[in-house]
Amino acid sequence: MRGLSFGELLDYTSDETNHWRDWFTKNPKAMDLPCDIAGMKDVREVVLHIVAVQMRYAERLLNLPITEYDELGSKSATELFTLAHKSAEDLRSFAVAANDADWDGTLTFPTRTAGTLTASRRKIFVHALLHGVRHWAQLATFLRQQGFKQDWPHDFIFSGVIK
């Protein structure tokens, strides 16, 4: 079966994150809107959550020290999107270098809210990307409801990834 590659999924999520970076640069007040997505108090915390999850999973996949979530709370929007870009590149580095045994191997790790989990690196990689897609979609809906419409279509079909 031929399907979407991990590289193509990463390209899509990175492109979407770049759109969000550019959009928040034009709409900085939107970062401070109160909201309750994923138990967060405002949009900035949701963005932090999206970035932190991707970054911490990339660090796990690469056997790097895991950044403490609390260290990220004071980051500006620019700093958060810089970290998002770096973590996407870290995920790409893992994907390019990984062999089948790497992908199928498991990691056991603590989470902030769900206890200790064990998952294959393949599952962790996919989760790191789909977690962001899910929360960006929630955020897009919330922001539109607050009068902050985005200026690009979010659907994969409109992306520049694959024909």
Where are these regions (language model features)?
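N-terminal beta-strand motif that seeds the catalytic metal site of vicinal oxygen chelate
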Residues: 1-2, 8
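Short, contiguous alpha-helical
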Residues: 7-24, 29-72, 112-163
